Amino acid sequence: MSTATFVDIIIAILLPPLGVFLRFGCGVEFWICLVLTLLGYIPGIIYAIYVLTK
């Protein structure tokens, strides 16, 4: 795991959509993460970490 990935994961824990946005831009991953975060903070975190580490 690189330092950039580690920083992305820390950002994803604090603000899940921001972490995904910084990596993928305004793509489908961002919108899925945003919806999951609005429905519940924990699902947004789980999805963000999953997407950032795959």
UniProtKB/Swiss-Prot annotation:
Keyword Transmembrane set for record: yes
Predominant localisation class: membrane
Annotated keywords: Membrane, Transmembrane, Transmembrane helix
InterPro entries: PMP3
Induction per the UniProt record: By low temperature. Also promoted by abscisic acid (ABA) and dehydration but is not a general response to stress conditions.
Cellular compartments per GO CC: membrane
GO BP: hyperosmotic salinity response; response to abscisic acid; response to cold
Keyword Transmembrane: yes
Cleavable signal peptide: none
Family named by the database record: Belongs to the UPF0057 (PMP3) family.
TM region(s), chain numbering: 2-22, 32-52
Bilayer topology: Multi-pass membrane protein
Protein name in the entry: Hydrophobic protein RCI2A
Domain of life: Eukaryota
Cellular location(s): Membrane
